[in-house]
Amino acid sequence: MDRLKYDIVVLGAGESGVGAALLAQAKGLHVFVSDYGKIAPKYKEELNRYAIPYEEGRHTEAIILEAKEIIKSPGIPDTAPVIRQAVAKEIGIVSEIEFAGRYTDAFMVCITGSNGKTTTTMWLYHTLCKAGLDVGLAGNVGFSLARQVAYDPHPYYVIELSSFQLDNMYDFRANVAILLNITPDHLDRYDHRFELYAEAKMRITRNQQPEDCFIYWEDDPFISRWVAEHPPVARLLPFAMEARTDNTTAWINEKNELVVMNLNSPFVMDEELLALSGMHNRHNAMATAIAAKAMDIKNEAIREALQDFKNVPHRLEKIARVKGVDYINDSKATNVNSTWYALESMKTRVILILGGTDKGNDYTDIENLVLSKVDGLIFLGIDNEKLHKFFDGKISRIADACSMHEAVSLAYKMASKGDTVLLSPACASFDLFQNYEDRGDQFRKEVLNL
């Protein structure tokens, strides 16, 4: 650390940060990586291999605050002291996606939304691959965009974007932008103000041109109002559960067919043939089909991809049937709206495992579904007081668990033949688990050990 002035300082040494460091070095920039926590061995080994200087367990301000530009990993809040100091010194702060976008002319398909973005990203990636395109998968899934731009470039990218990534994007342009929905989530990062969170999501349309496309859920009142008040310059391609206007591009007709119009040849497909069930997956399928049609993918390839796609892990993932009881892993449901969609898709009585780190949740949204479908609740978390306050007296069987082993054991005892045990926590996982993947993996392990 003898050189104190770097062109780029990367904060955070996960996939996003290390990818950004690799690209910065490949472009001849002097780069330094700083992580306040511990760097995973595989990333430390990579930084050593490329001789990129780094630190862990601290943020050395003397180095960071002398940088020409900072690339901030999405997990670091703007309230972090080092970020506040950098802003005060007027040091530019960008996301890894923004940085990577400077070094590629690839066609960018970007997906955001409070729920469904991983499924839609993977479904669209699957569709484009099936159509024969050379496409990279980036953002919150796959390898970082920066890493791919540096060492494995593609002419097309499908990118899942969180609101945190969109916050630090300024010049990046999405050729196709998809906004699936906006519901309260991560409000702790937005001063508990929904409008600030929603504005971050709408940044996906920033820098779009008339030849670009903006695909959005027309049934969402906030999105529709925003589009009316701030008309994007891109071509508008909305989808809805039924045709609302002449401009509606995709909907479900009276024959229960998914219809896409206004894009070259019409596309019609029986919704029963879709690989994934549930109302939310009809939305995801419509967005996928519109994007593929907008990119001139043939109907055959779209139809095939919509039929044979396999769902992503931790999203309504069926683990096993044990003594006539289905066990479903929906650990990726980290907000109430995701849990609403999971419950809506259930066809049996449910034992529901809820809880974790609350992000300002309002459980009123799932109350009716819980009352009509749930026979037992298991609260999995260190602090379940808010859940008890809301649900006590409404469901007769409620239990607390402080480990996944205990939660699955309780669910096993509560469930009857024909029921479904559903892990759909509606909360973040950081009180008891490393992340939602760890939570889902532990659920899978415990179920398979029954």
Swiss-Prot record:
Q: Which GO terms describe its molecular function?
A: ATP binding; UDP-N-acetylmuramoylalanine-D-glutamate ligase activity
Q: What does this protein do?
A: Cell wall formation. Catalyzes the addition of glutamate to the nucleotide precursor UDP-N-acetylmuramoyl-L-alanine (UMA).
Q: Kindly report the protein's main subcellular placement as a broad class.
A: cytoplasm
EC number(s) in its UniProt entry?
A: 6.3.2.9
Q: Which organism is it from?
A: Porphyromonas gingivalis (strain ATCC 33277 / DSM 20709 / CIP 103683 / JCM 12257 / NCTC 11834 / 2561)
SS bond list: none
Q: What is stated as this protein's family in its record?
A: Belongs to the MurCDEF family.
For this entry, the protein name equals UDP-N-acetylmuramoylalanine--D-glutamate ligase
Which biological pathway?
Answer: Cell wall biogenesis; peptidoglycan biosynthesis
- Record keywords: ATP-binding, Cell cycle, Cell division, Cell shape, Cell wall biogenesis/degradation, Cytoplasm, Ligase, Nucleotide-binding, Peptidoglycan synthesis
